[in-house]
Amino acid sequence: MTDLDEALAILQNKARRQILERLVREPHYPLQLAEQIGISQQAVMKHLRILEKGEFVAKMRVARNKGGPPKNIYSVQQALSIRIELG
């Protein structure tokens, strides 16, 4: 598991938070995330790699119905709750 400082550094990025918001609801393909968030698929892949390294998301290989190489679909790996009290 990622320590608190690493988790906060990962979550400070708005695009990563938007990705997680969608993955909490249901697994998504990178192209779906790119279309919903309004950033390139390449940028989504960069953020997914960071989220995967931080153990926020997991990648699953899904076979295609009509042949071809399998596709990757991403889902939230674990629940996370951060509560910060000031004062």
Predicted features by range, described:
Residues M1-A9:
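Short, Lys/Arg-enriched N-terminal segment that forms or immediately precedes the first helix
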Residues A9-R16:
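Short helix-coil-helix linker/hinge
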Residues K14, R25-Q32:
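Short capping segments at the starts of secondary-structure elements
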Residues E35, E52-K53:
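Alpha-helical residues within the helix-turn-helix
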Residues Q42:
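Key DNA-contact positions within bacterial/archaeal DNA-binding proteins
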Residues G54-G68:
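Beta-hairpin "wing" of winged helix-turn-helix
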Residues N65-G87:
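Conserved segment of winged-helix/HTH DNA-binding domains
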